[in-house]
Structures are given as structure tokens and as C-alpha cells.
């Protein structure tokens, strides 16, 4: 094969030369880093992290090297946290030092260069947005105000399942349709005329961003060679389509009605955001812009659909596989909703055992087994080791929640363990952190989990269930697939049988 100066191989040669020279000139650090596996030149530990399920790979390495582990991912240093004690020390005791986000290339594109809550850097901007989220957009009072919306869409969800009575259906698809409908209604108030376009964009975006870390994230020195990636250009195109749709919706809303200065009980999320844009009721140093609003809406749609569908599917699997839990859930749900036409939000609040099942499922199958990476803002010490400024801090919450010293028989689905040992997953118990904790904990836990509980309650009230293809529950394939989250590699197929019409 003829070699030419336009060959990509030349870029690789340039990079290798640049990297070698840079490493030779780089002063040796005297910091005592946490223990970890031996590294190779150039790639660090990437050869040991290349498996399909990184949370399991990292746990195996942490079992050898300790719950605070250093790995080299290309040019980047990463500190891996793998037990509850280290999670508390790093994420709570040193919470301010690790309050920044590590922003990868894909995230930067999808968030208008780190706008919104998920990838914003720590400071006044993030503080203001989290206040809006926790006090107005996703507070307990606000989520309860959405119950009528959830109940309406639950009717459609149940009707959709009825159309499959006696026939196989894919649960993830049914759950996703319900979740897209509810998040669009809670954001925009009425049924969004562009909903179908938005759903297509979200699905395509999810597929393209399924592997969040790219070569340029691991080797920043190579970023100049990667900026013209086909995948990144496709992502930019999709985000521009979403931007056009959201901009039109915002402009139409502002033209159609005067934005209220006072908060209202029945206002949708867009109304809340526009009120903060126009009137800045919190008195912050700055007002949010249309770009902020669009970034927030997009992250809300992504978080409220994909991860919640995962939570619902895994919970359904675990309940069906455990005859004792299945019997108790059926009895509880049908006892509370006896002779009713529909399940209501206040019914769901009474379903204590079913909600324990959801909690236990998120322990075994967290939607994000590796919490969104943080970035260290300053050096700090843990047990004599230095967590260096600029390092990624990655919490393996799956490993934390599989610790046999905390959770007897950790891989066993046992909802009753929370009766014996009450703890919640809102971030104060470091043994159970499927949604993160502290300054970077997920502000939408209540909204997401409530929607999962609504769907499960409706499914167990209206239908009996069997596994498709004549399989027994214990024969369900639990193989995981890792992308934007941890999903079932083979989607759950069920056959519904109508009980309460």
C-alpha cells in the first residue's frame, strides 16, 4: 500500500512523537497516589479497562488494589471510589474539592457547552439551577401536582398493554412511550405538537452518545485530530434540530401569554423557567437565558425517559423472578386499589412493599453503575494518599452496593432487608447511592422513581404476567449491556393477561 502525507498514519506518528517528548520533559510528581494496577506507556491502564462492563471490570481491580484506586486512562488520571467509607470521605467530607464535573466531548455538545445541572461547573450558576430544580421544578409538592398528568398517561399506557393481551410485548418500549408522554406534558403543559420529532431526536442522540468517553477525552493532546468526527457532526446536527424546535416553542409561549411573576400551583416546567428568565425571583446575580432553558429541557427529557425505563424494566424482572415478592406485590397493589378503575398517585404512596422492591432493584441494577465523573478542583489527602487536582473521580456505585460486609448476599433480591435495616437512596446513606449524593446528586430522583412506581402499580393491578416464549421467570437472561447506562442486553418480553379492566 502506498504511503502518502495525507494518510491518518502520519497523524498518529506526529502524536506519538509529541507524546513521547512531552512525557520526557514532564517533571516527575512526588505525590503519593492511591494504589492501582501497573501502567503501560502511552495507554496507561486502558488495556485492563476494555471489557464490555466497566463497572464489573473496575470492581475486580478494586478488589485487588483497594476501595480508593488510581488508574491511568490514556493521559488522564482517574481515582476510583468503590466502597461506602471512601464514598463518604471523598464525596461528602471533601465534597467541595470534587464538586466540578469532568466534561467529555459528547457532553459538551449535548449541553450547550456545559449548561444545565448535570455538567455545569460548581459555582453560582449551578447553585441557582439546583435551587430551581429542588424548590420548583421537581419538589415533592410539584411532583404531586403532576399526579393527574401521570394518571391520564397511565390510562393510555394500560390501554396500550391491553392491545397486547395474550401476545408478547417489549416492556421497555411501552414504558418509554409513557415516559416521553409524561415528561413532555409536565414540561410544556399540553400535548406538545412536536413531541414525535423530539422523541426521534432523543433516541438517535442516545444511540450516538452511548459510549460517552472518546479518544480525545482520554488523550486531550489528540483533540485537534478528532474535531471532525462523523459521530460528533451527527450529534451537532441532531442538537441543532432540537434547538430549532425548542426555540420556536419558547418564542411562541412568550408571544401567546404574559409570563406570570408569581408562582402558580398548576404551572408547567417551561412556565417556571420563563418566570426566572423574565423576573429573576431568586435574586441571583444573573438571569437564565433561552440557551439555559433549552439545555435544561433536553437534560430533563433524557433523564426522565431513558434511565427511568431502565429502572422500571429491572424492577419488573426482579419481582417476577422472586415468587415471594411477586405474591406480596400483587396482594398489596390489588388490596389498595380494589375495584377502582385506575391507579392513583395517592394509592402508589401507600404501596410500601412495592416501593421497597424498586429500591432493592436500584441497588442491584443502578441505571448508572458508574456515577457521572467529577473532577478534582484541588489536591486533598485520604488515608495518606493524594487525590490530585485535575483527576477524574469516578464512583462505582454498583461496587458500593454489592459490598458483602454491608449487604449480606448482595446479589440476592431481598426487598425485606430494608424492613430490617431502613435506609433511603436520596444520598444520606453512602451504602446506597444509585442516584449520587451531595452537591452533584440527582435532583430528579423523586420524579423518576415516582413514574417507575406508577407503571409497576398499574401493571400489577390490571394484569397477570408470564414470560414470553414459554420461559420460566428464572430463565430470564440478565446479561447487562453498558452504554449511556446499564440496560438489559436482551429486552424483557412479557405476555399480559387482563385481570382488572
From Swiss-Prot:
<comment type="pathway">
    <text>Alkaloid biosynthesis.</text>
</comment>
<protein>
    <recommendedName>
        <fullName>Geissoschizine oxidase</fullName>
        <ecNumber>1.14.19.80</ecNumber>
    </recommendedName>
</protein>
<keyword id="KW-0503">Monooxygenase</keyword>
<keyword id="KW-0479">Metal-binding</keyword>
<keyword id="KW-0560">Oxidoreductase</keyword>
<feature type="glycosylation site" description="N-linked (GlcNAc...) asparagine">
    <location>
        <position position="60"/>
    </location>
</feature>
<keyword id="KW-0812">Transmembrane</keyword>
<dbReference type="GO" id="GO:0016020">
    <property type="term" value="C:membrane"/>
</dbReference>
<dbReference type="Pfam" id="PF00067">
    <property type="entry name" value="p450"/>
</dbReference>
<dbReference type="InterPro" id="IPR017972">
    <property type="entry name" value="Cyt_P450_CS"/>
</dbReference>
<dbReference type="InterPro" id="IPR002401">
    <property type="entry name" value="Cyt_P450_E_grp-I"/>
</dbReference>
<keyword id="KW-0349">Heme</keyword>
<comment type="similarity">
    <text>Belongs to the cytochrome P450 family.</text>
</comment>
<dbReference type="GO" id="GO:0004497">
    <property type="term" value="F:monooxygenase activity"/>
</dbReference>
<keyword id="KW-0472">Membrane</keyword>
<comment type="function">
    <text>Component of the seco-iridoid and derivatives monoterpenoid indole alkaloids (MIAs, e.g. vincristine, quinine, and strychnine) biosynthesis pathway. Catalyzes the oxidation of 19E-geissoschizine to produce a short-lived MIA unstable intermediate which can be spontaneously converted into akuammicine or oxidized by Redox1 and Redox2 to produce stemmadenine and 16S/R-deshydroxymethylstemmadenine (16S/R-DHS).</text>
</comment>
<dbReference type="InterPro" id="IPR001128">
    <property type="entry name" value="Cyt_P450"/>
</dbReference>
<dbReference type="GO" id="GO:0005506">
    <property type="term" value="F:iron ion binding"/>
</dbReference>
<keyword id="KW-0325">Glycoprotein</keyword>
<keyword id="KW-1133">Transmembrane helix</keyword>
<feature type="transmembrane region" description="Helical">
    <location>
        <begin position="1"/>
        <end position="21"/>
    </location>
</feature>
<keyword id="KW-0408">Iron</keyword>
<dbReference type="GO" id="GO:0035834">
    <property type="term" value="P:indole alkaloid metabolic process"/>
</dbReference>
<dbReference type="GO" id="GO:0009821">
    <property type="term" value="P:alkaloid biosynthetic process"/>
</dbReference>
<dbReference type="InterPro" id="IPR036396">
    <property type="entry name" value="Cyt_P450_sf"/>
</dbReference>
<dbReference type="GO" id="GO:0020037">
    <property type="term" value="F:heme binding"/>
</dbReference>
<dbReference type="GO" id="GO:0016705">
    <property type="term" value="F:oxidoreductase activity, acting on paired donors, with incorporation or reduction of molecular oxygen"/>
</dbReference>
<feature type="binding site" description="axial binding residue">
    <location>
        <position position="442"/>
    </location>
    <ligand>
        <name>heme</name>
    </ligand>
</feature>
